[in-house]
Amino acid sequence: MDKNLFSSSGIWVRGNLHAHTKNSDGLLSPEEVIDYYFSRGYDFLAITDHEKVTTVKSEKLILLPGSEISVGKCLLGDSYHILAINVDNNEALQKYKNESVQALLDFVNKEKSFTIVAHPYWSKLTHSDLLNIEGYIGIEVYNGGCDIEVAKGFSMVHWDNLLTQGKSVYGLATDDAHYYGDLDSARGWINVKVKERSAEEILSSIKKGNFYSSSGPIIEYLSYNENKVEIRTSPVERVDFVSEGGRGFSVSLDTYNKVKQAKDKIRILGKVEITHERENEIAYVELGNSKITIKTERGGIISVVLEGFSFKKYFRAEITDHNGKKAWSNPILF
């Protein structure tokens, strides 16, 4: 991810990279799926029917050709599910379905396309399963269908294990939609920063990691330098900065309110100041050699600034709103 992603020029476009139609095991036709996402304000879509590329044209959405391929065996016996994006060679995909996972990844990369490992938790993928293959750009950190069906939609632990091992991969939120009607759809998406609305620009930005993922809340701004991290968001319940091992920082509204109520009794805290600015409440907290500034508005956290915090190998931001919906930045690597 570009460190200046949120301050650089460009526009944000919203899209889903995992959806199924009647051409595999979805309930809607390709045209109905396009209409569904268009009516909900999406800009682009990848239809990823199982083992095949669904070819369809539309003036409503930017369409990225793709497919979901089941291939190989993981250590626990199930297949990997690989999203191949910007691939339209059905014949070749059928061939590589019977090859190794690595052979499929290598083929897609030669086609100037990219791959994503779908729903690692749902697929029973271990850390070794993900560590021992190369060439995929990311994993589904959130899969809406796996979440609502069997409570196995989140894969943050898989992601952090890979990042800790030095494997540079992105986290993507998707739907994996089959049923629609807002049941397993419009649940996970990526917001991509582009210079213009085109398939080429969207694909290029995704490959560079110039996007963030969400199931609800908005990351309005994120910046990092050696001594300072700042994030601004829509009102949320919790803000996390995740790094290697026991490093990182987390603040929730519950923690925030307890600090306010007992600021003179919490021994690890230094100076604590609470001020008000129009509708905003601002808390300034000293914690050892570190400084924390938290701004709230209408019962939600809207910004956090950390100064003097030490991260190792990487850090990523994760926010959670009052409904439990999340958003994830891509990692900044050190």
Where are these regions (language model features)?
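A metal-dependent hydrolase metal-coordination microenvironment
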Residues: 2-118, 124-135, 140-161, 165, ...
